[in-house]
Every structure is written in structure tokens, then in C-alpha cells.
Amino acid sequence: MLISSDSVNRLAEYVENRDEVFCSGLFLSARWMIVSQLDHIGIQMIILPDRDSAEYCAADLYHLIEGDRVYFLPDSGKNLERSNYKSSLGVQRTSAIGKILEYKEGEQVIVVTYPSALEEVIPEKGRISGSLLKLTVGEERSYEDIKEILFSSGFERVDFVSEPGQFAVRGALIDIFSYSFNNPFRISFFGDEIESINIFDANTQLSKEKVEYVDIYPDLSSSEDEEGSMVTDILPADTLVWMDSSDMYKDRQFFQELNRFRRIYMELPLSRQDEEAVRFNISPQPVFNKNFELLTDDIR
């Protein structure tokens, strides 16, 4: 798939100088190639119609972009029964929210989400900061202090951790399964000093990686407090938002909140014929229905 560098350069220029930019001729995965080529500094949030389309987009971007820069922000699955899938949604949501809160100027971060995930209330920023447990190799921290913070953040003490929201104490070790990571952490102490921090496999108990510090997040996937915050409340002012169309979400709760951010619309709405739209002129992939003769003719 060939994408004109002139169109990408024009898009980058418009993004720097306009509050909203309209595109035309962008189809399917070509959109995510454009996102990967834009090389934008800051947070980019891609809002798609539903969970399935957002998951597919995130999967494409994982392959297109190197490093841990892509985050999927799903809903909390609060109406689902307890399961590994619901637990996975909570981890991904907390991880994405945590990354937004930890964002440092100059980073490149992409968050993929959808309306129902944006409209769920999250804890207020102050409450999140108060329940965040930061641990660093070499610092002095008492067992009791750590256990008290974990209990107050809703963590459950168990014999062996197996899922997010659990911790275990064994001798000079504390195992903690954070809500923002797919594997638990093993904190090793020498007296009251943190001697080492290891990421380990909960099934095999084998160490996977040694790290120098860790941020242990409680469950940020939703909030029981109706007066909590929205995800849009914690986004930096220079966030760049991608959406399908300006017409698609205009009646949704979150849409008006997005007016304070720069926006890229990946479709030119019927209500607007903008001669200044960035045109990519990419044709949608034909449907061949396993007819290889048609496929051969198309390639030729």
C-alpha cells in the first residue's frame, strides 16, 4: 500500500496550525499507517465506534509502532461476570489511564478507545495519586506501610497471587499483582530496604525481568463515585484526537469535551465539503470472496 508522503506532510502541517483537520480517501488499515507515519509528539487518542473496531485498530498499531507506545482503553466490563476476559479489560483500562497520568512532555503515546469507554467515570486525579504505591530499589519501606497502602487500595491478601488486585507476603518477599500490568511483581527486602524488584510469571513463579522501580496502581477501571472524573479531564491540553467523522458523535456525552483538543476527522462528513481537506485518494480493498482469478486480475 503506497501512501503519498506529500499528503502525510500536509496533514502534519495542518495539525500544527489548525484546531480541526478533515481527511478524505482513508480506508481501513491505511488510517493506522498514517497514524504511525505522522510522528506526532504527545498523546494521540483514537476514538472508534465500538470495542471490536478499537481492538482491531490497537492490534494493527502494535505491529506498526515499535516500543510500548500503544495503549488500548476499553470499558471496565462492569456488566460482565467475573472472568479472565473481564480481568484483562480492567488491566488494559488501568494501564492506559496510568500512562495518561504519568505522561511526560516529549513522549509519543497512542491511546485507542471508543465512546462507552470514555463515558465511564474514573476516580478523581487526587484520589488516584493518593492510592498509588511507588517502590524503588534501594529505598527504605516497611512491610507494614506497604501492606496498609495495599489494603486501603482494595488489594486482597492471598497465599499466592494469580490475578490483579492480590498480594502475598512470604518471609522477606512481597508479591503484588498490580491492576496496570499483565504480570505480578516480587519485591525482595533486606531488612526494611528494597533489595530487588522482579517481574515474574504467576503460573511458573519464574522471574521474567528485573526492574529498578514500579508503580502499583489500584483498580482505576471505574469509580463508584458519581462525582468522579472523565478520562477527558486528565488528558494534556496538547492531546491530538482522531475520530471517524464530526457528525458521528455529536450527540454523545463526551463530544463537547473534545473541543478543547486538536482533532483529526478521518472522514469528510456529508454536512461539510471542505476544499482544504487532506486527500489521500486510497481505494478500498476489493472483495474477492476467495475468487483467485479476480485477485490475480487486481494485482495485475
Label for each model-derived stretch:
Residues 1-300:
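ASCE RecA-like P-loop NTPase motor cores
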